Amino acid sequence: MTSSDLTQRKGLTMSDSTPDTPRSTPEDAARRLAVLSAQNERLAQVLGEARGKIVELQQQIEEFAKPPGTFAVFLAEHGDGTLDVMSAGRKMHVGASPSVDLTQLRPGQEVSLNEAFVVVAAGGFEPVGEIVTVKELLDDGRALVVGRSDEERVVRLAGSLAGAPLRAGDALTVDTRSGFVYERIPKAEVEDLVLEEVPDIDYGDIGGLGPQIEQIRDAVELPFNHPDLFREHGLRPPKGILLYGPPGCGKTLIAKAVANSLAAAVARRAAAAAEAGGTVDGSPVLVETANQAKSYFLNVKGPELLNKYVGETERHIRLIFSRAREKASQGYPVVVFFDEMESLFRTRGTGLSSDVETTIVPQLLSEIDGVERLDNVIVIGASNREDMIDPAILRPGRLDVKIKIERPDPEGAREIFAKYLTTDLPIHADDLAEHQGDTAAVVDGMIQRVVERMYADTEENQFLEVTYASGDKETLYFKDFNSGAMIQNIVDRAKKSAIKDFLATGQRGIRVEHLVTACVDEFKENEDLPNTTNPDDWARISGKKGERIVFIRTIVQDKNGSGRSAAGRTIETATSTGQYL
């Protein structure tokens, strides 16, 4: 084959294998342009994200490379943009960033310093610290405080305490490095021992104690409502009142009613002064202030005052009277109520206890009539054993007024029953039918019936036979041990019986039989309670005073309460009465 033949064949082959190139249309160009634009947008977005990530990483690198900042405590500002601060125990004179408002800084406030020791930000006040007690307030925003181990030091008052009514004895938090006190801490030990709320009990809630209520109103409210007359006659109001008598007869209720009545008297007095545009104790009274007028009732939990550490009980008594003086200085009457007073203030030197009262009693005496006057404060003590209270407390000038709270007589029992057995209670239909539907008449009849049963001098009501030291014997009835608390319990028993009968029979309402049965059941529960081991102590607490009792015989009733068993139950008196309470 010649070269010309090969050339011809090659040319034919190339010409045969090469197709014709198609011509581009405008639609194809537009489509390719759209694809390229989308790719360009995605690329720009990725580049933007990468740029932002780079900037973020650069900022983190700069943050990591920064030197650590420090905190300091602001002391004073000099007016030229420079400050005195305390940092790490060192007093420093530094500058401040223009972004910091120096007029808002207060002494003791935290500030932030940069690496050049320039104040760049303001913070708050230190929320933690050691506890110290204020001993004396000094000039220029300083105070003398007592810390651990009775260590005394002078500290500065932080701006957070500006205007706070501080006084000696307040507990404060202190930052020992800067020497600032920041916050007043409530005294939990006093809060646990007293109750400042004014009770919602008034004299109308107390039955059977009309003469005693009149006595205590004359002693407490008369001097408060008419102070000018007392000053005119040179008469001082009583400093204290002793309520004594058997348990459950209303001593605590009377004390609460006194506080409530004083609060109402304060409100009336302030309201009258506000309407007249006058003053109370030299200060103008607004209507809003008059509406907030009240009194304080410090209910001291007596046994909780006792402490195993020497001097702690006396310190608690001082704190309580300090609290009372603080409230009284604001023009509010304060009632300090000691319940079970004999547990704290026994006769000194009797040897019936650990003799802690040798220092507790003098502390109370110094608080009541010591060098510091006790104005607008009335001390009320309640006790079942007034014979065990130290005579120095009971003398005139301390507990001036002594009111005996007797057990209720039949008329008093009717008044007490009427407080708990009211016409709004459901009454059984049969009892209503007997009185032509008159609910008030039904209730009066119920009360009359149960009081007659309770106070009857019958054999079924015999409770105890006591033998005195002289050999005389006396039979005591359940009425001799009746109390307001027992009457309330009888009514509650009757209500519960009425509920049980309704659930069993479907008949709703209280019946007179419920009350009589409740009275008998209450007697049954109490017949095992007399302390025949120490009969004289038990009788004194129960209100039976006079000749010493050496023997008690309980008279056991039949189960149905219809009569007395043939043999009474006796327990021999111990030869040594031992320690009581």
UniProtKB/Swiss-Prot annotation:
InterPro entries: AAA+_ATPase, AAA_ATPase_domain, ATPase_AAA_core, ATPase_AAA_CS, NA-bd_OB-fold, P-loop_NTPase, Prot_ATP_ID_OB_2nd, Prot_ATP_ID_OB_N
GO cellular component, one term: proteasome complex
Pfam families: AAA (PF00004), Prot_ATP_ID_OB_C (PF16450), Prot_ATP_ID_OB_N (PF17758)
Pathways per UniProt: Protein degradation; proteasomal Pup-dependent pathway
Description of its domains: Consists of three main regions, an N-terminal coiled-coil domain that binds to protein Pup and functions as a docking station, an interdomain involved in ARC hexamerization, and a C-terminal ATPase domain of the AAA type.
UniProt xrefs under SMART domains: AAA
Quaternary structure note: Homohexamer. Assembles into a hexameric ring structure that caps the 20S proteasome core. Strongly interacts with the prokaryotic ubiquitin-like protein Pup through a hydrophobic interface; the interacting region of ARC lies in its N-terminal coiled-coil domain. There is one Pup binding site per ARC hexamer ring. Upon ATP-binding, the C-terminus of ARC interacts with the alpha-rings of the proteasome core, possibly by binding to the intersubunit pockets.
Residue segments, region Docks into pockets in the proteasome alpha-ring: 580-581
Biased composition annotated in UniProt, kind: Polar residues: 14-24, 572-581
Family per record: Belongs to the AAA ATPase family.
Binding site for ATP: G248, C249, G250, K251, T252, L253
Keywords tagged on the record: ATP-binding, Chaperone, Coiled coil, Nucleotide-binding, Proteasome
NCBIfam families recorded: pup_AAA
GO biological process: modification-dependent protein catabolic process; proteasomal protein catabolic process
Regions crossing the membrane: none
Function field: ATPase which is responsible for recognizing, binding, unfolding and translocation of pupylated proteins into the bacterial 20S proteasome core particle. May be essential for opening the gate of the 20S proteasome via an interaction with its C-terminus, thereby allowing substrate entry and access to the site of proteolysis. Thus, the C-termini of the proteasomal ATPase may function like a 'key in a lock' to induce gate opening and therefore regulate proteolysis.
The keyword Chaperone is annotated on this UniProt entry: yes
Coiled coil (UniProt feature): 27-66
Name this protein carries in UniProt: Proteasome-associated ATPase
GO molecular function, one term: ATP binding
Annotated segments matching region Disordered: 1-28, 561-581
Xref: SUPFAM superfamilies: P-loop containing nucleoside triphosphate hydrolases (SSF52540)
